[in-house]
Amino acid sequence: SGAAAAQTAAASSLHQASNHTFYPWMAIAGESTADPSKSKIRSDLTQYGGISTDMGKRYSESLAGSLLPDWLGTNGLRRRGRQTYTR
């Protein structure tokens, strides 16, 4: 199920980050278990009830329910054509 976990992590990182998704770089901080519900970080997240209310309010105000989080800039994950950043 390693391929399935990698597939769900890749799919979920494209979309909105929710509490039950497992990201591969989380394994550095906590003990790396295959089940994300057993990890220490996940239990710390559920202790605070997931997304706090003011964060949800900021989310809906800034992007109106879009899937991109509001800490991304306008060109956060967008690719530019053949225009280079440094010349």
From Swiss-Prot:
Any one GO MF annotation of this record: DNA binding
Protein localization: Nucleus
Similarity comment: family membership: Belongs to the Antp homeobox family.
UniProt motif (Antp-type hexapeptide) ranges: 22-27
Protein name per the record: Homeotic protein ultrabithorax
Tissue: In the embryo, expression is seen in the epidermis, somatic and visceral mesoderm, and the peripheral and central nervous system.
A single cellular component GO annotation: nucleus
Statement: the UniProt record of this protein carries the keyword Lipid metabolism: no
Keyword Iron carried by entry: no
